[in-house]
């Protein structure tokens, strides 16, 4: 399986915008992640697209090695735009890996912590 490209989607929801990354593979599996470009990180979409371009042809199931490559090629600042872009890419790669293995992503991260959650609206 290899990364072939990405698509970014933006949706206005009235009180905030939602942004999504769709990471595509040659096997037809698409990984999806959400990121936030609404507050202070204008340009995040461009950084995500540029970083994905450097990983075309790589196996997204090797997400840790790819994350290390991205870390090495970018200048890091805590909570900075590069870290936000890398997080969106890594989340999409984890989604791909979970789909390929037929397991939820939380199983890849050590298992579920709870089986229900209280909502406030």
PLM ranges: what are they?
Residues 18-20, 88, 118:
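Broad gene-expression machinery/nucleic-acid interaction feature
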Residues 31, 115-121:
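Hydrophobic faces of well-ordered beta-strands that scaffold small-molecule active sites
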Residues 101, 111-112:
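Subtilisin-like serine protease catalytic core
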Residues 108:
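Active-site-adjacent beta->alpha loops and helix N-cap segments on the catalytic face
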